[in-house]
Amino acid sequence: MELENQLSKLHELKNNLKEMGASLCLASLEKKSAELELKMQEAGFWDDVQKAQEVTQEAKRVKDKIDKFKNLNERIDDVEVLKELMEENDEETAKEIISEVKALSKEIDTLKIETILSGEYDRNDAILTLHTGVGGSDANDWTEMLLRMYTRWCEKKGYSLETIDYLPGDEAGVKSVTLKVKGEFAYGYLKAEKGIHRLVRISPFNANGKRQTSFASVEVLPELTSDQDIEINPVDLRIDTYRAGGAGGQHVNKTESAVRITHIPTGIVVQCQNERSQFSNRDTAMGMLKSKLIELKERAHKEKIEDLTGELKDMGWGSQIRSYVFHPYSMVKDHRTNVETSNVNGVMDGDIDNFIIAYLNS
């Protein structure tokens, strides 16, 4: 019975892949790949190293997409041949077919999402910021739990993480943290996480064991590439320096290497303290500011600056995009798509793709 179901699924996957091939415009991709290859062979191509690296990366992305599509088609054909050659009661071949169809289904779903992620910044690296909301020490602890969740998700996706700014809680957890997430489609995927995340649990900080509700916000911005850069008038900036490592002790930097930049016309404030020098911190902070200004420009119809990185106006009741309930029952529910699961431990260990994909498909 399972074999029949998977063979039926195989036919569906073949049709899905055919539709994706049309939407991908495979012929256009192959033409673009050839053009990029010629460009890379031009004299003086490496004169501008940064631009050359971007062209090389784009060429690799285009070729990888073409190769992935062709490989999936070939594997579907191979399964169909295997089915034709399979003898009656051949359990080993049946297991092989079932396993391969399941793998194909997962890979085609991923390709479908990456086809949907066609926005100008979707392929970019991402700047992920977590802020504590309502809930005191519980909320700080909740922010740290979310930090771990996203760290585990990034590890599973093969993305690398770099801490840009980190402010610990007074008693426990994290007040705020900003990370750079490096990897293809990092922004495209993580933009689905923008908003308020709500936790309900028995508080470990309450001696009476009372139930506590905590909130944290997730902001996501694309990191801009050189060809997406924007000019900022220096007179619009106020740049302050301060000592990094606010928790004190041996980690305090004795020089004022941390940088805070305020964009005066909009009131946007960005800061970075984790690079080795004031120059590097300033460079990173400027990149963050440009990303925020780009997103603000794209959402110019919004009236308030809080809308810059999602609906973050009220970090409290009724504003959450997702609820994580640990007590009196176990459930994580996304209020935008109504996708839910009782596997709370799995979610907190980074298994959030079902929420992300459902949102991107909506």
Swiss-Prot record:
The PTM entry states: Methylated by PrmC. Methylation increases the termination efficiency of RF2.
The residue stretches assigned to a coiled coil in this entry are: none
Q: Which Gene3D superfamilies match?
A: 3.30.160.20, 3.30.70.1660, Release factor
Which controlled-vocabulary keywords does the entry list?
Cytoplasm, Methylation, Protein biosynthesis
Task: Output the superkingdom of the source species.
Answer: Bacteria
The entry's family comment says: Belongs to the prokaryotic/mitochondrial release factor family.
Q: What name appears for this protein in its UniProt entry?
A: Peptide chain release factor 2
- Species source reads Clostridium perfringens (strain ATCC 13124 / DSM 756 / JCM 1290 / NCIMB 6125 / NCTC 8237 / Type A)
Q: Which gene encodes it?
A: prfB
